[in-house]
Regions:
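Bacterial Sec-dependent N-terminal signal peptides
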Residues: 1-21
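Sequence-level preference for short, compositionally simple segments enriched
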Residues: 21-342
Length: 342
């Protein structure tokens, strides 16, 4: 009997230990478990049944970060004072590398990742204000040189096979294009809440299924703020709810090159936004499902433009705006708001 009781106690203690959340602390001054974010990531196993927490204390971490592991929460102490920053132009990177792995400040391949209370910055365009530079480029087979412009692609976040990504109360910024690039057109599910995003052309450009709520978008340059690729599945969509848009005089809202599906609900636009609807860029791509751009209760400071008048009734299934939420986007595949926090 005693042996049986001891065995039960041992099992319960083991379960409790297994259920405990792994937590490591990053502190650039050396007062934590690790000085760099990458060291903390590298210290953990590739996977785990529950999220591992990497708590990052205030500071500026000038490093490029790679995450190929699953089930991680990177949480900053303060979004304004916990800064991950690196300077890299995509065109420079691709001169010596065959793909985009490493092109961003934060590079993701793992899934079930949460980013919280962080600033993630690609500072290339902010640092290089001269306009353009010429570099040696082995990928250029003719001249072996390339001109890098300040407005070119500069990714703060770039994902690959990643799905079930949550970004909460973060600042993501670059001066150039494709600042926030969560790309997984066939299976990617991405959730953004209470974030600030800033950049150039297509600086928020998800592929797959994306939901952004109460986010602010700031355009520094370029012919569009938002972009979407939903070409792999007619159900994929990008939803922007209670979001605000501002930027340089005459900034344009959005565009697409492939099949896309936009829903803008209760969004607000600065007075200096251009009178230009989300538009299709002419290419050789075949658009199979037609134009799918929908608005509800969106307003510009001053006089409204007619093109964002309510048209949800024309969307498939004529959805009710009140029912457009994460569950409506991700269906039964994922509910980012109901999952237990570590």
């Amino acid at each position: 009997m005693w042996k049986y009781c001891i065995h039960i106690v041992f099992v319960l203690v083991s379960c409790h230990v297994d259920a405990q959340v792994t937590r490591v602390v990053v502190d650039a001054s050396g007062q934590g478990d690790y000085r760099t974010i990458q060291e903390a990531i590298n210290s953990l196993p590739d996977d785990a049944p529950a999220p591992r927490v990497i708590f990052i204390r205030k500071g500026v971490y000038r490093e490029k970060v790679f995450i190929e592991k699953n089930n991680l929460l990177l949480e900053g102490e303060d979004k304004d004072q916990t800064v991950l920053s690196f300077a890299i132009a995509r065109d420079t990177w691709r001169c010596d590398h065959p793909d985009d792995w490493g092109v961003a400040t934060l590079n993701l391949r793992g899934s079930d990742i949460t980013l919280k209370n962080l600033s993630i910055v690609n500072s290339y365009g902010f640092d290089n204000t001269a306009g353009q530079v010429e570099i040696v480029c082995s990928a250029d087979s003719v001249n072996h040189r390339k001109t890098i412009i300040r407005q070119g692609h500069q990714m703060a976040l770039r994902s690959f096979q990643t799905t079930r990504l949550k970004v909460i109360n973060c600042i993501l910024k670059a001066y150039g294009g494709d600042t926030v690039s969560p790309w997984n057109v066939s299976a990617g599910m991405f959730y953004f809440k209470d974030c600030i995003m800033e950049g150039g052309v297509d600086f928020y450009c998800p592929r797959g299924w994306a939901y952004a709520e109460h986010c602010s978008f700031i355009a520094d340059d370029g012919p569009a703020c938002i972009w979407h690729d939903g070409s792999a599945d007619s159900d994929s969509r990008t939803v922007l709810k209670d979001c605000s848009f501002s930027g340089y005089d005459g900034f344009k809202l959005g565009r697409y090159h492939r099949d896309a599906q936009f829903y803008l609900i209760h969004c607000s636009f600065a007075a200096n936004m251009a009178d230009q609807d989300i538009y299709l860029v002419p290419t050789t791509n075949i658009i199979r499902w037609g134009r799918r751009v929908y608005y509800y209760d969106c307003h510009r400071k001053g006089t409204d433009y007619s093109w964002y008048a309510d048209n949800l009734v024309s969307a498939r299934g004529a959805p009710d705006a009140a029912g457009i939420n994460p569950h409506w986007v991700f269906r039964d595949k994922w509910d980012p708001e109901k999952e237990a926090q570590p």
